């Protein structure tokens, strides 16, 4: 006997007031931002970084990073937008690339810390864990938009029904790569919280290095499962960038361990 399996797909629109639509995608990003900022302001005093400095940085970096993430995505997906230029501005439909946001945010952070006479690595060490938790939450925006998913699989019975149903796309269950990356970032955040409380364990800049290696490794593996990777000359751009992050992070640790004058992170 044939049976019809019922599936409940979630509406990507959370609130609709006339022409105004607020999407879950935006809510997830904002929730990640708010929690990340809160955690950074709590940790900042350990490096003598004022709350006002963190808030001022976010007010500048967040909109520019979203813009950078969109430009990055459009640049590598130009064929989707060249015939409808106005769709470039429809960012609420999804289509931002984390690496574009990270690159833009890093540039803004460098100039901001130089202008405020703040040690750049100290600021990075405070911000990096917050970025991880923000990414962990923000990835759920992809869940609601049914994007950034993986290859087709026979079943997802190991997942709760609400995730399983949402990952039924184009007639097949899809690997929930958004979930893999969310959990990976959450685990990385937890490890950082433990490691930075150990006396004389992490040196200045090594929390940043940990983020680069941890996120780079996770993204390198997870990106290989996705079906919507941004490509350039037949290459998955994010995997190459992940390799660069890993290499930079390892070099940072090696160089800093060779210098006894570099201070340890104070728990």
UniProtKB/Swiss-Prot annotation:
Q: Which residues bind a 1,2-diacyl-sn-glycero-3-phospho-(1'-sn-glycerol)?
A: 139
Residues passing through the membrane, by range: 20-40, 57-77, 88-108, 117-137, 175-195, 205-225, 235-255
Q: Please state which protein family the record places this protein in.
A: Belongs to the Lgt family.
Coarse class of the primary localization is membrane
As for what it does, the entry says: Catalyzes the transfer of the diacylglyceryl group from phosphatidylglycerol to the sulfhydryl group of the N-terminal cysteine of a prolipoprotein, the first step in the formation of mature lipoproteins.
Q: Which GO terms describe its biological process?
A: lipoprotein biosynthetic process
Q: Is the Cell membrane keyword given for this protein? A: yes
Q: Which UniProt keywords apply?
A: Cell membrane, Membrane, Transferase, Transmembrane, Transmembrane helix
Protein name according to UniProt? Phosphatidylglycerol--prolipoprotein diacylglyceryl transferase
Q: Which PROSITE patterns match?
A: LGT (PS01311)
Cellular component GO terms, alphabetical: plasma membrane
Please state the pathway this protein functions in, per its UniProt record. Answer: Protein modification; lipoprotein biosynthesis (diacylglyceryl transfer)
Q: How does it sit in the membrane?
A: Multi-pass membrane protein
Q: Which gene codes for it?
A: lgt
Subcellular location(s): the record lists: Cell membrane
E.C. designation(s): 2.5.1.145
InterPro entries cross-referenced by the UniProt entry: Lgt
Provide any one GO MF term from the record: phosphatidylglycerol-prolipoprotein diacylglyceryl transferase activity
């Amino acid at each position: 006997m044939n049976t019809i399996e019922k599936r409940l797909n979630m509406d990507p629109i959370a609130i609709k007031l006339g022409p105004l639509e607020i999407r879950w995608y935006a809510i997830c990003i904002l929730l990640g931002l708010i929690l990340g900022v809160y955690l950074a302001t709590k940790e900042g005093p350990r490096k003598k970084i004022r709350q006002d400095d963190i808030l001022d940085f976010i007010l500048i970096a967040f909109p520019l990073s979203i813009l950078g993430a969109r430009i990055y995505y459009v640049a590598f997906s130009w064929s989707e937008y060249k015939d409808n230029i106005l769709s470039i501005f429809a960012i609420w439909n999804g289509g931002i690339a984390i690496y574009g946001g990270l690159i833009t945010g890093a540039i803004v952070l460098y100039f901001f810390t130089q202008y405020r006479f703040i040690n750049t690595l100290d600021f990075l060490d405070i911000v990096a864990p917050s970025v991880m938790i923000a990414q962990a939450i923000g990835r759920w925006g992809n869940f609601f938009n049914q994007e950034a998913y993986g290859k087709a699989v026979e079943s997802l019975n190991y997942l709760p029904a609400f995730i399983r149903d949402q990952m039924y796309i184009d007639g097949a269950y899809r690997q929930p790569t958004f979930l893999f990356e969310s959990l990976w970032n959450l685990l990385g955040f937890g490890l950082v919280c433990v490691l930075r409380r150990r006396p004389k364990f992490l040196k200045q800049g090594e929390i940043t290095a940990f983020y680069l290696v941890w996120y780079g490794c996770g993204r390198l593996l997870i990106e290989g499962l996705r079906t919507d990777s941004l490509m350039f000359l037949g290459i998955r751009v994010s995997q190459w960038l992940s390799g660069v992050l890993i290499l930079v992070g390892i070099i940072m640790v090696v160089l800093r361990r060779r210098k006894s004058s570099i201070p340890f992170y104070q728990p």
